[in-house]
């Protein structure tokens, strides 16, 4: 290092900015050409000015402390510098080493906000035909006190004095290739290029506050469990008053007491006595469209399904609706009085069903009996 700037000002290497400033002012009053016209004193005055220029600037001081001389490029390169003759400033040096790396510039304080999600419950008929619902959401909104700027009323953001608004600072590192200058986001302004000296008291400088709002959501016909409805721009407002993200409304369909939904079809079960199954009947059923009758034809068997077309859920995409599938369950009486038993026996006799058709008939051998006879040689 060609010049010890700390020695020039007579301060320690860990001196504060206030100590550096006081030392410079004291020497400047003593060595100013108007006070002391001696030529040697004038050279000394130039030295303290150069030392103060470096040590009072956090960026230049950092470069100097890491082994570089931030003033060397002004003289076309020096013994302890980069030999950077022809470069106008640090940006020129960065361009030479890293191309466009130093042209990133400060990042914007205004950024898009995050998306938000809320889950709402709907009844089956609401999902089938569509509806509108008022929902309450708690998201970040623009602070009305500072209009998203983050600064207290009557104040504004100021250019960062560490990076001079560039959003990044340069530093010198030593490697086997020699001294290399690199850049990184400014630690004082976090890369924004500006700082907020007096933050807004309402949002603490963030530019956003939490707020509960009421929104009206249109639920389209045909939504199902897990369907997400996107509300553009209704999510979290971004930092610095940036545009809001989107709000996603996730549908949770509540179970129905009668119907089970499978896709756009609805399923239900009706229970009828065996006499109704044999003779046929009409069963009243409350559907999504109101009271209707299910036509049970004579001879209907337990487990048989009867479709009612177009009585299901509206198709979410395209027209039309799914079906209502009615499953029939036939019950058998568990206890009969003597008269009922007599009548059933008479019916069985008339139908030739005194002996159950599935009963094992005498003289017939089962599989295991035949295998046993074969093993015994019979």
UniProtKB/Swiss-Prot annotation:
Its cofactor is Zn(2+). Zn(2+) 2 binds at residues 160, 163, 186, 189. Residues 297-319, 351-378 are annotated as: Disordered. Pfam families: DnaJ, DnaJ_C, DnaJ_CXXCXGXG. Disulfide bonds: none annotated. Residues 358-367 have a biased composition (Polar residues). This is Chaperone protein DnaJ 2. It comes from Streptomyces coelicolor (strain ATCC BAA-471 / A3(2) / M145).
